[in-house]
Curated annotation (Swiss-Prot):
In Caenorhabditis elegans-killing model mutant strain is attenuated in virulence. NCBIfam families: livcs. GO terms for molecular function: L-isoleucine transmembrane transporter activity; L-leucine transmembrane transporter activity; L-valine transmembrane transporter activity. Belongs to the branched chain amino acid transporter family. GO terms for biological process: isoleucine transport; L-leucine transport; valine transport. This is Putative branched-chain amino acid carrier protein SAOUHSC_01411.
Length: 447
């Protein structure tokens, strides 16, 4: 394993590790109580396992997900990827990184959510993002060699001090309504990891990783796949360590029922409260600055990864517009949304993500299956169409626009996984139909 692979792996870790990835584990640790281990292991399985799978599957075809999705349908490939890139990019995730950075770095210092302060902060924030993203070939070096080490050092400092401060406490009782047995805790952790929706970002980041591997001089598809897998495993190990560590500390932090009730009444995020408490207990008044640095670095690396991924994709489908022009357009969009109407955008984006996410996971699994089992195009199209339609009706029913009893009665509906057994049945149906349809088996392009 060479230095380049390590740098790519750490870059991938930094791009995945956004502010939300800091907040989820300690919150899960607190809620899981005596059933911490089944909950956190299940969280790791879906919260890290699915994104890792998403990254490495993108390396099966020399054209990445563009080539793999074209095997299902070229029109579907373009539409699906445009929706994914815009939703996790300038219309949702990138503006959120800026606003989250402001709320956790500047707001605690000025004790105000000043719109002027937010405006100034986001100008500086996106200038830095612009500088890093204008040359995508240097993204890996700038993030993997500089920003990631800073991020890891600051996180490790907080984890070590947090462990020393709180590990001596016994685990709290947790949320016994959700975590009352090994099975229920595993199921809840599985669902929470799934709901991070990082698997969608994996489709975007896969292109960056594959391109970075190619820049090292590797051209054969099987070697690209191996290097992508290795880089993905490096990122996964780092994420696993941090998730379990933060979750364990959260599991041993003493938080009274009164405090929890007060936080809920003020609509404050409990995970943010736990992180703030961890930092202030360990480092006093400096703790809020340390946490601010961690959040800013985590958000910045994620924003850079998303800007590069989105811009490269749109430049690829509209080559007449330069990559740098797309970078400027998407940064400007993100800047405007970060300062105006972010809550409205989030409320609109979540239903879209809830529709796209099951389709994305289904697509990843179908591509993986087709690598090892001869698969016809119709055999992939049928489950994708069925899962897509089901996801639309699931969101409609969940939003209360129309109560659909069939959807509500599906297995795993309580865990937002009702699409999964349907996807399995649809995949079997697709393969049965494929037996009677004259099509050549799908072959992913090799060098």
């Amino acid at each position: 394993m060479n230095k380049n692979t390590w740098v790519i792996g750490f870059t991938l870790f930094a791009m995945f590790f956004g502010a939300g990835n800091l907040i989820f584990p300690p919150n899960l640790g607190l809620d899981s109580g005596q059933f911490f281990w089944p909950a956190i292991l299940a969280f790791v399985l879906t919260g890290i396992g699915l994104p890792l799978l998403g990254v490495i599957v993108g390396a099966l075809d020399k054209e990445g997900y563009i080539g793999a999705l074209n095997k299902i349908s070229p029109k579907f490939s373009i539409l699906f990827l445009i929706i994914i890139y815009l939703t996790i990019g300038p219309l949702f995730a990138i503006p959120r990184t800026a606003s989250t950075s402001f709320e956790m770095t500047i707001t605690p210092i000025i004790h105000s959510n000043s719109s002027i302060a937010l405006f100034i902060f986001t100008i500086i924030y996106f200038i830095v993002v612009l500088y890093i993203c204008l040359n995508p070939s240097k993204l890996i070096d700038r993030i993997g060699s500089l920003l990631t080490p800073l991020l890891l050092i600051t996180i490790l400092a907080m984890i070590i001090k947090g462990y020393l401060d709180f590990s001596g406490n016994s685990a709290g009782k947790g949320n016994e309504a959700l975590y009352h047995s090994n099975f229920s805790s595993f199921a809840e952790g599985f669902t929470q990891g799934y709901l991070t929706m990082d698997a969608i970002a994996a489709i975007a980041f896969s292109m960056i990783v594959v391109n970075a591997v190619k820049l090292t001089g590797i051209t054969k598809t099987n070697q690209i796949f191996k290097q992508t897998l290795t880089a993905g495993l490096i990122a996964a190990v780092a994420l696993i360590f941090i998730y379990i560590s933060l979750g364990y500390i959260g599991n041993h932090m003493p938080v009274s029922d009164m405090t929890l009730d007060q936080l809920k009444s003020k609509d404050r995020n409990i995970g943010t409260y736990l992180l703030t408490t961890m930092a202030s207990t360990g480092f006093g008044s400096f703790g809020k600055y340390l946490l601010g640095i961690i959040v800013a670095l985590a958000c910045l690396t994620t924003a850079c990864g998303l800007i590069v991924a989105v811009s490269e994709y749109f430049h690829r489908i509209v080559p007449k517009v330069s990559y740098k022009a797309f970078v400027l357009v998407f940064i400007l969009m993100s800047f405007i949304i970060a300062n105006q109407g972010l809550n409205a955008v989030i409320s609109m984006s979540i239903p879209v993500l809830s529709i796209v996410y099951p389709v994305a996971i289904t697509v990843v699994l179908l591509i993986l299956i087709a690598k090892f089992i001869p698969t016809k195009r119709i055999s992939q199209q049928i489950p994708v169409i069925i899962v897509f339609i089901l996801s639309i009706f699931s969101v409609i029913s969940k939003l209360g626009w129309l109560k659909i009893n069939f959807i509500e009665s599906l297995p795993l509906r309580a865990y937002s996984l009702e699409w999964f057994p349907v996807a399995i049945i649809a995949t079997i149906l697709g393969y049965l139909v494929g037996i009677f349809v004259k099509q050549d088996p799908i072959k992913y392009q090799q060098e």
